[in-house]
């Protein structure tokens, strides 16, 4: 079993924020992969399903971003899983918009949701880093991540999420390189 947590802020006013692209990714997977309906558990929303032979618990913490790790840690301990069984989908300023990279381990890189997750489960979880680009100046980061995607980005955002959905079996089977390759191939066509 694996836990795939999307990071974001709860509430409809944040739904289309760049910071919520992790929620968008797991919402897409729940819908497109016929996961169970979302229900409340572990200080968040969960949806259980299967990809290939792997059971996956999708998780959207109901806490704000800065406390995301509490829900992830609670679910991980309940299922007696290791941090290596956890994947976190999150926005990434240092990656070009709508690009996807996978990384195992590492620090928070200034991301408060990752900082909280590290505090609750350690660093050895896998991250699916969803590029949102950088506003250019550090002073503009807060407003940028809490801003909605621009209308001009909606097609690219949908393309990225669809590519993730199509390539997701590779992630479920721990073939991160093939997952990224399949996303890149699907986005070129």
UniProtKB/Swiss-Prot annotation:
It is found in: Cytoplasm. It comes from the Bacteria. InterPro entries: Pept_tRNA_hydro (IPR001328), Pept_tRNA_hydro_CS (IPR018171), Pept_tRNA_hydro_sf (IPR036416). It is an enzyme of class 3 (hydrolase). PROSITE patterns: PEPT_TRNA_HYDROL_1, PEPT_TRNA_HYDROL_2. Its main location: cytoplasm. GO terms for cellular component: cytoplasm. Transmembrane segments: none annotated. GO terms for biological process: protein quality control for misfolded or incompletely synthesized proteins; rescue of stalled ribosome. The record marks 9 as: Discriminates between blocked and unblocked aminoacyl-tRNA. The record marks 91 as: Stabilizes the basic form of H active site to accept a proton. Keywords: Cytoplasm, Hydrolase, RNA-binding, tRNA-binding. One of its GO terms (molecular function) is tRNA binding. It holds the Pfam family Pept_tRNA_hydro. Belongs to the PTH family. Hydrolyzes ribosome-free peptidyl-tRNAs (with 1 or more amino acids incorporated), which drop off the ribosome during protein synthesis, or as a result of ribosome stalling. Monomer. This is Peptidyl-tRNA hydrolase. It comes from Zymomonas mobilis subsp. mobilis (strain ATCC 31821 / ZM4 / CP4). The lineage of its organism: Bacteria, Pseudomonadati, Pseudomonadota, Alphaproteobacteria, Sphingomonadales. The gene is pth.
